[in-house]
Amino acid sequence: VNDVTAEAELFVHPALFYRNQSEYLAVNVPFIRAGLDAGEPVAVAVPRENLELLRGELGEDGAPVRFIDMQQAGRNPGRIIPRVLRAFADAHPGAHVRIIGEPVWFGRSAEEYPACVQHEALINHAFTGRRVTIVCPYDTARLAPQVLVDARATHPVVVADGEHLPSGSYAPDHVIASYNQPLSRPSGVPVFSFSFDAALLPDARHFVIEHAVALGLGDGRRDDLTLAVAELTTNSVVHGGGTGVIRIWAEDEHLVWQVEDGGHIGDPLAGRCPPPPDRPGGRGLLLVHYVSDLVRTHTRPGGTTTRCYLRR
């Protein structure tokens, strides 16, 4: 990784395959130290177990490093690019930036995983032309084989067993498309639905809040829900054909709700990257990602479904 980084003028995005803590430290610690020695900004955004592992290994030398608990900051994979990666890189314009980002860990749910894979694929577009190196570790001892297949498809370089080699299966756009699948229907639980147009936007919001309270959403999340519902329903009216349907139900520890409309999201980075400061609008879906614990989307010509999860 260090050799790749030293020669890099622009974006580098390797996957690191590791089997144990020793292999994890053997690559990541020299990568961090090389960045610090070069005066480069370094961030580490990984699950808390690995965060503490790296923090302990670096000791006082790690003081300049920005440590981020990915299980909190990246709980929703859709906000990792804007809130974690871009936020750090944009804070250091002109510098070569190093980031260790581990968005996929053992224990990610089946609902979260497709959003993780799309996130990894989208990084390659979000940082085109930027002087950034983002190393993404993958625990080969615990993650499913398909996860490693997807990692090879979303990273142009794979670091394993001390070597860094081009990935022969690198195809991020194919990954983005292949994980854009219809969302599974809820089963075995009551689902409440409401159809809306511009005149019924206030009623749609009231409908969701009323059912969310009945389904056990805590007071601390109601403002998040209100904001997200307002953004998505307004987006349906303005960009999604003028009408939509909102559905809400409870699923395990989550409140789940979704908006269906006749629009089509043509840019897969929509909601994943902050728009330029001088561009009016374009922040609605971004805000939805910020306040939700998970956002899943299926979009096609003539219809889009956006599903949001909030812990109750």
Residue map of PLM features:
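Non-catalytic regulatory/interaction regions at protein termini and inter-domain linkers
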Residues: 1-191, 195, 202, 217-220
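Amphipathic coiled-coil/heptad-repeat helices and related helical stalk/stem segments
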Residues: 28, 119, 229, 281-284
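Amphipathic alpha-helical segments that form the core helices of the histone-fold
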Residues: 33, 229-233
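Hydrophobic pocket-lining residues that define ligand/cofactor binding sites across diverse proteins
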Residues: 35, 212, 236
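Conserved beta-strand-loop-beta-strand hairpin that lines the nucleotide-binding pocket
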Residues: 121, 182-185, 234-312
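Conserved short strand/loop->alpha-helix "switch" segment adjacent to the catalytic nucleotide/phosphoryl-transfer site
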Residues: 202-230
